[in-house]
């Protein structure tokens, strides 16, 4: 990733996280005067410390300094050196200043008068001397100490927005001490809601529902389908109009040049004055005609461009209207899983994440059917019985997790269980017994290829038909449904730990961003989400591994395949034509050689039916282009399966040392920053938000290295290191502590706890991290 782009991304993420963090801090500060003060102080201290570390990591010195000063006030309050009421007031005001700095990061490095004054105020309250901020403006000390502040409550926007703590009865403020708004406070935020002011709180929900109902109508899905197709066709037609407009302009240019040539020729020949005068009038008319023509073309261009833009917006709105939240079908799953597990004498918990993400409504039925089958498989085949789980040391209740995320135009739905996993050897034997493959073929299968046997029609490892599954409708049906929608299915599993099935689907069937390439005179498209890079294959980058052609891509050998012959096309591309598209599917990559690139654009997709897919397995659909041609859209998963079959030796080439690293930090900013460094070294990263979660992950997975922060909820980094080193099964995994705590005492505590290395976050870089990792692994 580009360094500047990464920094912008991290700063944006910092702003989002810090806004939520400040809300938590303010709620915690308000609890300092309550019975839960000890827990509140601990929570506030952790949030302030994490914010300070994140800010310093991103070079936001003013925010880091202000958070540090706030920590001092909190510590003084806990030690009884500062009155709780005074500490509460000043910490809330500090939150306001931090919020202002966070909204506009331009002053978050060197600070501004408000932040500098706030640091001094915090230092006075805590009895500390504030250190200077690097790059800050020197400020003269005040000539005399300020007068004691008037004890008046301070109302801030965040405080107004925060949910009130429960009370026994409403308490009115004293009439002589009206709340005073800070200069930066928004009056609208402080104003009471009209309904609440008149005692009509209960009427608000019904009024809101009525307002929503007034803005909503039911639309038949067939109407939306027709609108989607029409919008796509109109978009293509408007693009053709733009093309014709460009061609018209080029035609007028040719006409203008021809007129100029004619007039120059007339000037060179000897003609009478009368003819000369007529030619002059013709010249004048030609210039007027040319000017009128160009004005017409420009007006036409403007109109067509406006039309095209509006049609593009309309197509986007239609595509958005087709999206419905997955919760529409997910809401029925908890009860379904409960009933399935009861029939099996099992207890299974279902966890669903991000069910509010939308999917094309025409896909809902197929998505529901596929997921129901996956849930049935997880309950029946995956999760063990309570007795077996108890013997294995697992929780008696099994767990199935449905996780949804969006990656570009594609939707990823993962169904994960913590059951017995999939045994590749058992699948090989089942395939042999069912005569799907012979023993030689089974032995040649890699572990992943053996697991993918579950997608063979009629394949099952069950000898008996159960009430729940095993009735001849298998994973091949799931795969076929998903691929008919232009998607793909992936599976990963670890014996004894569970399995994960991932459905990868287009979020919308109306429009898709594709990369268009040329093979001969024809145009083909690949989903942009499947394209990792485009490149020109240099002779020096080509290599041969075990008789298979490959190319170096990002330092690793990648199968090099001519796309034309793979699709069964005669002639066309050869390896002396350098353009190539690097596509990916799961962990597989391939460089597909083409004849040329066209461009990347959004197209209206017309999917092919299942019968067509059987006859042409590499084809996912078609799209009309503005020049009248039809682009054939390729199904990358099928192509990658064929490439894997053709280029199997490439996957057997010796790979560079690649570690599986567990990164433990409660700060998402720190995880993103440190994770980028680890990935830059070529290693894979998994994350945990605290020591407790990390220890569970280590028990259930295999890692080559653990990087951990120190100050975290539930289980801190020192305690995590001690627990890991006292557990024989994982004691040999190297542990590196990454912390903003830089004192010799902190480093000694980390190493005494069992850490193999202690690195300070402020000094962290690729070289420092690489040296530590190389030394320990």
From Swiss-Prot:
Location of the Histidine kinase domain: 270-509
Domain annotation CheW-like: ranges: 511-645
Listed EC numbers: 2.7.13.3
Top-level taxon of origin: Bacteria
InterPro entries referenced in this protein's UniProt entry, alphabetically: Bact_Chemotaxis_CheA, CheW-like_dom_sf, CheW-lke_dom, CheY-like_superfamily, HATPase_C_sf, His_kinase_dom, HPT_dom_sf, Sig_transdc_His_kin-like_C
GO BP: chemotaxis; phosphorelay signal transduction system
Region (Disordered): 129-149, 164-212
Compositional bias per record (Low complexity), positions renumbered to this chain: 178-197
Modified positions (4-aspartylphosphate) in chain numbering: 709
Catalytic activity annotation: ATP + protein L-histidine = ADP + protein N-phospho-L-histidine
Residues in Response regulatory domain copies: 660-776
Domain HPt: 1-108
Gene Ontology molecular function, alphabetical: ATP binding; protein histidine kinase activity
Keyword tags: ATP-binding, Kinase, Nucleotide-binding, Phosphoprotein, Transferase, Two-component regulatory system
Annotated SMART domains: CheW, HATPase_c, HPT, REC
Biased composition (Pro residues): 139-149, 164-177
Listed CDD domains: CheA_reg, HATPase_CheA-like, HPT
Sites of Phosphohistidine modification: 49
Function statement: FrzE is involved in a sensory transduction pathway that controls the frequency at which cells reverse their gliding direction. FrzE seems to be capable of autophosphorylating itself on a histidine residue and then to transfer that group to an aspartate residue in the C-terminal part of the protein.
Protein name (Swiss-Prot/TrEMBL): Gliding motility regulatory protein
Lineage, broadest ranks: Bacteria, Pseudomonadati, Myxococcota, Myxococcia, Myxococcales
Gene from which this protein is expressed: frzE
